[in-house]
């Protein structure tokens, strides 16, 4: 699920829905969610010309998929959105026999995603991760002291803390299906709840801190927290670690940390899937098989700092990534992780209404 600087790949262009079916491939993925040379290497190996476009929310992707004729051959929705899209006929089944490297997949991770989607032929998990809080150690300590609750959602969701952090900048993901369930866990409700009153309570809690937020955006926080322009953010795990790495590389004095709150958080899976009306299906399979190669999967993990669905890639993944509990949680930490359910139409309307009211500041 995941963001940052837009990378200019060879072949980046507008999609017009009339791409030639031979020798081309149109991919739509989250921004900053692939190693810098992966596309160029695939093109060099296969001769297939790739058009690689990026989005910053599942809602944007879903709108294109449900409208039809998107022109894309491969997309990477989060599992719950893939489930909804499949119900609407927006995606086709994936024939795993056409993907030899599918055998590299972590069967446990894939099984969790398959249960969420409701099918074992919807697609293959690309990356998985959590939602938590990233923060600037020094800037937060200056305002909240050494006993700042850097293990809890209260760091941001408690209005008293948010007020003290307002001057250094707080940001929240523009991702209602990730944020609202976690606010519910902070309030003591199950993150898997679909009770209207629980969503309303979560919306009220967010509205209480709305005056102290710098912005609600999913693609801006990586650079801003790395540069010290904000000091705390609700972020996806890999984005937070990319920010920490960028700050370290820049030697700018900002130390960024990330944690999974002790109240619990959601576990999500991003899945490579083929739209129902894809024109370049053969090339989509070739690309998925390439992405499932152990060496390619490891290179992508080492760049984006998200956990991989590829078990065979583990030996080539940076040990720092493998050992970080914010990326690969311990078994104890996993006990507090939950998978957001696929919302029905009524619940989805509640989520949209609550989120719009909060984001508008009403």
What are these regions (language model features)?
Residues 73-76, 214, 231-236:
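Paired acidic/hydrophobic, glycine-rich loop segments that form the ligand-binding mouth/hinge
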Residues 15-21:
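Sec/Tat signal peptide C-region and signal peptidase I cleavage site
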Residues 22-85:
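Early extracytoplasmic/lumenal segment of secretory-pathway proteins
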Residues 76, 82, 86-212, 219, ...:
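Extracytoplasmic ligand-binding site segments that recognize negatively charged/polar headgroups
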Residues 270, 275-336:
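Mature extracytoplasmic/periplasmic domains
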Residues 199-208, 214, 252-273:
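Periplasmic-binding protein-like
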Residues 81-84, 232-253:
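A ligand-binding cleft/hinge motif common to bilobed small-molecule-binding domains
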Residues 223, 331-362:
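Conserved C-terminal helix/tail region of periplasmic/extracytoplasmic solute-binding proteins
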């Amino acid at each position: 699920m995941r963001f940052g600087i837009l990378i200019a790949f060879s072949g980046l262009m507008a999609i017009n829905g009339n791409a030639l079916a031979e020798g081309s491939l149109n991919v739509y993925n989250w921004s900053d969610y692939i190693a810098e040379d992966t596309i160029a290497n695939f093109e060099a190996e296969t001769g297939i010309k790739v058009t690689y476009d990026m989005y910053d929310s599942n809602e944007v992707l879903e709108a294109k998929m449900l409208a039809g004729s998107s022109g894309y051959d491969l997309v990477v929705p989060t599992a719950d959105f893939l489930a909804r899209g499949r119900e609407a006929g927006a995606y086709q089944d994936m024939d795993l026999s056409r993907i030899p490297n599918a055998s590299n997949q972590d069967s446990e991770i894939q099984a969790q995603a398959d249960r969420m989607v409701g099918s074992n032929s919807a697609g293959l998990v690309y990356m998985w991760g959590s939602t938590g809080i990233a923060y600037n150690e020094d800037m937060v300590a200056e305002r909240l002291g050494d006993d700042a609750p850097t293990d809890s959602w209260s760091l941001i969701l408690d209005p008293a803390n948010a007020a003290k952090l307002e001057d250094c900048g707080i940001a929240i993901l523009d991702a209602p299906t990730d944020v609202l369930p976690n606010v519910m866990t902070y309030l003591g409700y199950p993150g898997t709840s679909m009770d209207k009153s629980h969503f309303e309570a979560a919306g009220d809690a967010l509205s209480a801190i709305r005056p102290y937020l710098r912005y609600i955006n999913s693609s801006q926080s990586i650079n801003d927290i790395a540069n010290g322009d904000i000091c705390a953010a609700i972020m996806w795990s890999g984005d937070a670690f990319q920010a920490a790495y960028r700050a370290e590389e820049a030697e700018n004095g900002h130390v960024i940390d990330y944690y999974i709150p002790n109240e619990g958080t959601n576990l999500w899976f991003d899945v490579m899937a083929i739209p129902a009306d894809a024109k370049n299906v053969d090339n989509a399979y070739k690309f998925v098989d390439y992405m499932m190669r152990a060496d390619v999967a490891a290179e992508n993990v080492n760049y984006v700092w998200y956990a991989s669905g590829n078990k065979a890639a583990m030996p080539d993944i940076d040990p720092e990534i493998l050992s970080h509990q914010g990326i690969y949680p311990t078994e104890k930490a996993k006990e507090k992780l939950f998978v957001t359910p696929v919302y029905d139409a009524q619940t989805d309307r509640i989520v949209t209404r609550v989120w719009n009211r909060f984001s508008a500041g009403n």
